[in-house]
Swiss-Prot record:
GO terms for biological process: translation. Keywords: Ribonucleoprotein, Ribosomal protein. Belongs to the bacterial ribosomal protein bL35 family. The keyword Plastid does not apply. Residues 1-32 have a biased composition (Basic residues). It comes from Elusimicrobium minutum (strain Pei191). PROSITE patterns: RIBOSOMAL_L35 (PS00936). The keyword Ribonucleoprotein applies. HAMAP family: Ribosomal_bL35. This is Large ribosomal subunit protein bL35. GO terms for molecular function: structural constituent of ribosome. Residues 1-54 are annotated as: Disordered. InterPro entries: Ribosomal_bL35 (IPR001706), Ribosomal_bL35-like (IPR021137), Ribosomal_bL35_CS (IPR018265), Ribosomal_bL35_sf (IPR037229).
């Protein structure tokens, strides 16, 4: 059986919390921010949370087996 390894791209983008959820950064914060409203930019400042039972969470379990 081959060694289990974390997906290097997922490792850089997602972090597992103590409760088993995954943290991620919100998209759209790099450029072209002027036409966006302040409330939208403020919302993107917060971290996104991915629940482990969601479809994305199940994929992340496969991508990050060592976490």
């Amino acid at each position: 059986m081959p060694k289990l390894k974390n997906h290097s791209g997922a490792k850089k983008r997602f972090a597992k919390t103590a409760t088993g959820k995954y943290k991620r950064r919100k998209a759209g914060r790099k450029h072209l921010l002027t036409p966006q409203s302040g409330s939208r930019k403020r919302e993107m400042r917060q971290t996104g949370i991915i629940k482990p039972e969601s479809a994305e969470g199940k994929l992340l379990k496969k991508y990050l087996p060592m976490d």
